[in-house]
Each structure stands twice: as structure tokens, then as C-alpha cells.
Amino acid sequence: MSLVHTTIQLSEVVEVHPSLIPVINRFGIRLGLGDRTVKDICLEHNLDEDFFLTVINTFLNEGYFPEKKLQTFHTSLIVDYLTKTNAYYSRSQLPNIERHLSSFISMSSENNPSLALIGKFFNSFKDELLNRIEQDEKNWFPHCLELNNKLKECAELVQIGRAHV
């Protein structure tokens, strides 16, 4: 398993793995990378290098999931990335799939029960996914951020308490 590191040119990685383009877009990185390294691009976009590399390497390597490292990242970093991922699927991918599927179904012979079933399955899946995304945005993400803030407050109180001992 070959991992991306800070000294590699990001354009080389994208050339080999074009499916990475939507992932780097979520970090505000657009094509036209030139010969800049991952480190250069992270500095330019004010990105946490470790978080960026962890996301990229997790995406590219099925067996790579650094659970301990993920636990070290600030909750807001993770929530921001997941929010952008949700937006990508709800605003781009789902409408694109729906448009192509609808076109395919409308161009096919009438009374095809298999296509009708596929259409129903997709609509059901889309509704479930959009509902999950809505729950993330309204409940789960705010809860995670609030919990993180409370933990931070507790840690600050512990520090204050130690200072007075």
C-alpha cells in the first residue's frame, strides 16, 4: 500500500487517481495544481496537512483507516469535511444519477417492469440518503460540535482548578 505524503506533487496523485478530484474539491482545491507538492497546496489553502493526508490516503487505500489518528483531529475539521461531502452527494451526485437514470428509463421500451423497479429502488434510496444527510446537518453534527465544546470547557475548568491547587 503506497501512501501519499507531503513531498509528492498532488498533480501526480490526481493523474493516477482522477476519482480523487471531488475529494480535493471539498478542501477548496481546484485543478491546475502544477508541480506543487501536497505541503505547498496545504499551506496555500490553509489546510491541516495531517487531516488532508489522512482523508486522501483513506480514500485511496481500502485497508488504510488510522482510527487513532482520526481521533486526534478537531471535531470541527471532521464535521466541515463531512458537511461538504454531504453537499457533494445531495447537490451533485444524486441529481446526476437521477437525470441519467430517468433518461435511460424514458428511452427504453415501455412497460419494462425491471426498469420501473430500478427507478423505485433509486427513489427510495435517494429519499433515505437525503433524510440521513438532513439528520446529520440538523442533529448529529451540531450535537458533536456541542459535545466537543463542553469537553473543551471541562478541560479548561480542570486547568483552572489545577492552577489554584
Describe every region a protein language model picked out.
Residues 1-164:
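Small-residue-biased structural context
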